[in-house]
Swiss-Prot record:
Gene name per UniProt: dnaJ
Organism phylogeny: Bacteria, Pseudomonadati, Pseudomonadota, Gammaproteobacteria, Vibrionales
Positions bound to Zn(2+) 2: C166, C169, C188, C191
Protein name: Chaperone protein DnaJ
Subunit structure: Homodimer.
GO terms under biological process: chaperone cofactor-dependent protein refolding; DNA replication; protein refolding; response to heat
Signal peptide range: none
One Gene Ontology CC term in the entry: cytoplasm
Amino acid sequence: MSKRDFYEVLGVGRDASERDIKKAYKRLAMKFHPDRNQGDESAADKFKEVKEAYEILTDPQKKAAYDQYGHAAFEQGGGFGGGGFGGGGADFGDIFGDVFGDIFGGGRRGGGQQRAQRGADLRYNMELSLEEAVRGVSKEIEVPTLVHCDTCDGSGAKKGSSAETCGTCHGHGQVQMRQGFFAVQQTCPTCHGKGKIIKDPCNECHGQGRKQKTKTLNVKIPAGVDTGDRIRLSGEGEAGEMGAPAGDLYVQVHVREHHIFEREGNNLYCEVPVSFAMAALGGEVEVPTLDGRVNLKVPTETQTGRMFRMRGKGVKGVRGGGVGDLIVKLVVETPVNLSSRQKELLKEFDESCGGDAATKHKPKSEGFFNGVKKFFDDLTS
């Protein structure tokens, strides 16, 4: 598959200044960054494409080569001469870190020296009942992760020894493959990007500085969370390499469906059945809330589907904004399993509502059938 033009990738013209290129990169990096698009392979590919375009177009030598030869300038065996590995030189990762670190708090520092890599972030999916989500709860969870080896204190080296600076890249973690008049930055094949090598590894972790362990954590879930909310536990992710800081643990909340209530924002919704007689004559019906049962006054001649708002009976949002309401929908139940006598009484009642009294006693039915009659009259006229 052919590569897209680097200028097109960043959405800038060929006469764009370095400032314009950095501005375009910053915007696209935020849009497609993997932390913002977890599980989206398409976004990850676009992020890599944007990063590659930025690294080429902000380096004067690489940009000049690209402007003259296009993508062929960076292909192996592209006619620009051979070369070997070499340490030192410009660290293009520092350029990337200057921009990218401003956005996400990362980036390398310190004259191109390679830092040990921070531990990976972890995600834990937590399922809650509606009651737990609304009121808040503390949950104990077990998380399989990598922790610092306590035998070598995370260094990976045996006690009494230490990691040494890599002789191939001189601690940079990257080397340059020279191709004619420019160089391409690559991960050091000796230390695999770490900048250091361990000649006498720890027997416990075999030089990794980390080992597998299941951690038990107590997670406090604040009141008002909902499905999709994420709780960050700083430093509870995987331990970093060679004593580097640990990543974070993100607890992803999912609230189970409730058998009575549905939640929308800070409001709760429920359906309450009422009898045919109560809907017609009025009365009181018991309504469930998260705080207990309350009585709702049903007006006379209530139609099925009518909504009632009970203020302050919803959810207090986790981000503030007050307490939501409980929206109650009354559903008029049709009587079933009627006796002969009950059927006769209903027939008598229905007959008493017919004739001239139909409009008075059945306003919706009368309006519906008048509408149907008008519809067919219009079709035949």
